[in-house]
């Protein structure tokens, strides 16, 4: 599959041209729940960024900062704490530069920036092109560290290289098909192992 990548024409794009970036929510981590169905995405390199699970009620009750009983930190509207799925979450602190595709709604810390498809680029994010983009974004990880955070202002100005079509636009179809091919190869490999 590497040969296929090497045969492509690549072009540099600003992250802010490809994505609409949202800031994560600066909140205290909600009380963890045994029956929670909403993931909390934190500055983690593992488990798709998920550090815990919560109910909507847990998230709604968690204040922006401090202790709710002491009225330190004003609680925010639930709509500011919940993010739509179908996006890529990039860690900007802690395990800096990891990118995780989130298919469903979630909540996250301010150590994470959710990236959504920029409609000006006329593309729709899906699981396959998002997984390709996660790999591309993670190629930038070496530039950042705990002491040099990839905060939103830096992230927006960061450049990534993408395969392009004959018109010089990102080749979304190629990215999607490439990821599907990798997943099919892995599926076949696992089937041969009888796992």
Where are the predicted features?
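DNA target-recognition domains and sequence-specific DNA-contacting regions of bacterial/archaeal
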Residues: 17-159
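Non-catalytic DNA-recognition/assembly elements of restriction-modification systems
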Residues: 1-26, 31-49, 166-195
